[in-house]
Amino acid sequence: MKNYLSKIYVIHYTKLIERKKHMISEFDKWNVDIPWEIFEPYDQEDISQLDIIEHFDMMAFRGRHSREMKTGEISLCTKYKKILQKIIAEDEGDYFLILEDDVIFKEDPLKYINNLIAKCEAENINFDCIFMGEAALRVGDNRDVFAKKPYPSTNGLCTVLYTRSAIERLFASLENYRITQPMDWEFNDRFRDLEFEVYWGKAI
């Protein structure tokens, strides 16, 4: 089986030590033999005021949500953006999987993803990102689905496959316009504005 996936990143909060152990166990269980990285910088305790000014429009956030942005939300957004930046600057390849650190795979993730990308290539299906997480609306969903998802297109950000082109465009957008929402809804609007081809795959 051809391997299409270039690297896996895991967003991790370092104080949750058991979650890091869990993710390493998941990779061992499924014999994940491609590069992966547990991304730890920018914990909520380490975010500086300069980080906030650079990445966030807090006045707009308060106007949208009538509250202050939580430190955990700030950290998650910053980690995600820094991963996108790192991929662009340091990694080769065309496809990247970004995970949150509490993912439990129900099947071999590499096999499923490689087969799905092969299907897309064979059938000339162009996608920017594919959601494969069992979160929120998809708890207990075991259907083998693959369909284009209109706005609002996100369902949590726990298991998302991106193309390099999508990562480059998304990062450029985040550089040009500061974050004004929690990450899930921020990405919903960015994907719409960037005219992303968003699909939902099987919740693996």
Explain the meaning of each model-derived region:
Residues 1-99, 103-204:
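An acidic/histidine-cluster motif and surrounding catalytic segment
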